[in-house]
Amino acid sequence: MKIEVKTLAAKDAGAIDLDDAVFGIEEVRSDLLQRVVKWQLAARQQGTHKTLGRSEINRTKKRFGRQKGGGTARHGARSAPQFVGGGKAHGPRVRSHAHELPKKVRALGLRHALSAKLGAKSLVIIDDAALDAPQTKALRTSFEGLGISNALVISGAEVNENFAKAARNLPCIDVLPAQGLNVYDVLRRDTLVLTKAAVEQIHARLSAKEA
């Protein structure tokens, strides 16, 4: 399918062909998107939570109270979980929350996310994401002309330094190189902005032959 290309000045810059296998999926699977997002968020979770267990509490191990005739349970250590100051039973431990997800599932999830943006008419293609000077005001004006206020901008192989500096002062605007494209960042912003170079790299990465 063809989609029009704009400049940062909101002028026409021709059109570009989008691969239907990447951008044209009609039935977007929300369950697949959820799997990929959960995989991404699990990998970034710290997992540094920790409580002291029974064996890590420095309290007396001497038996206290009578063993018989007291009418109460027998206790062999003050570090037992039922006592104040005792160890935590089955408490959290330092661990990694990351889990595996097949590469084909991740690639399919990214294709569904891109198709969802195109289907919702929230995909904008620009010819280039570059500025002569790192001026936030100029970039804000350009985005206003394109009707963009909350967006993820995907550049080519590298992000233009002036563009990145200007964009980082704008709230709700994220800028990533094409290799950093991911499902979570695509879905968390209202609009997806791709450069022509980014589209070419996405096609090379997610085309049917490579998937």
Swiss-Prot record:
GO terms for biological process: translation. It comes from the Bacteria. Residues 63-94 are annotated as: Disordered. GO terms for molecular function: rRNA binding; structural constituent of ribosome. Gene3D superfamilies: 3.40.1370.10. Keywords: Ribonucleoprotein, Ribosomal protein, RNA-binding, rRNA-binding. GO terms for cellular component: ribonucleoprotein complex; ribosome. Disulfide bonds: none annotated. Part of the 50S ribosomal subunit. One of the primary rRNA binding proteins, this protein initially binds near the 5'-end of the 23S rRNA. It is important during the early stages of 50S assembly. It makes multiple contacts with different domains of the 23S rRNA in the assembled 50S subunit and ribosome. Forms part of the polypeptide exit tunnel. Belongs to the universal ribosomal protein uL4 family. This is Large ribosomal subunit protein uL4.
